[in-house]
């Protein structure tokens, strides 16, 4: 990420602020509705609208992204444990990270329309692609 990208990501995530868990849950719900095959990784979850389990996992997603934003210069170090978990224990198909990234971008665009400029969109897309790359790096 360029310095400008890092600035855009930090500024956008700063505006997310206290809504991070809410937006994380909304992005998950959006992903489940738009890409139903992603539900197969959550057979034990109540996937209905407003589910406590979806909200809880959305909070985990948001916390991981907050950690990533705080460690933009060392994403592999910051996300190593999550990479191990998703590659070795959960065995999530890597394409699902792209689907969640897309759902997150749509969610952020809907909540931050005035701030979601083309430059911010591009920077967030690069950031989420980097996060996805790190999370799938231990699959090899």
Swiss-Prot record:
O2 binds at residue 57. The modification Phosphoserine is found at residues 2, 34, 48, 101, 123, 137. Heme b binds at residue 86. PROSITE patterns: GLOBIN. Keywords: Acetylation, Heme, Iron, Metal-binding, Oxygen transport, Phosphoprotein, Transport. The modification Phosphothreonine is found at residues 107, 133, 136. One of its GO terms (cellular component) is hemoglobin complex. Involved in oxygen transport from the lung to the various peripheral tissues. It comes from the Eukaryota. The modification Phosphotyrosine is found at residue 23. Residues 1-140 form the Globin domain. It comes from Tragelaphus strepsiceros. One of its GO terms (molecular function) is organic acid binding. GO terms for biological process: hydrogen peroxide catabolic process. Red blood cells. PANTHER family: HEMOGLOBIN FAMILY MEMBER, HEMOGLOBIN SUBUNIT ALPHA. InterPro entries: Globin, Globin-like_sf, Globin/Proto, Hemoglobin_a-typ, Hemoglobin_oxygen_transport, Hemoglobin_pi. Heterotetramer of two alpha chains and two beta chains. The modification N6-acetyllysine is found at residue 15. This is Hemoglobin subunit alpha. The modification N6-succinyllysine is found at residues 6, 10, 15, 39.
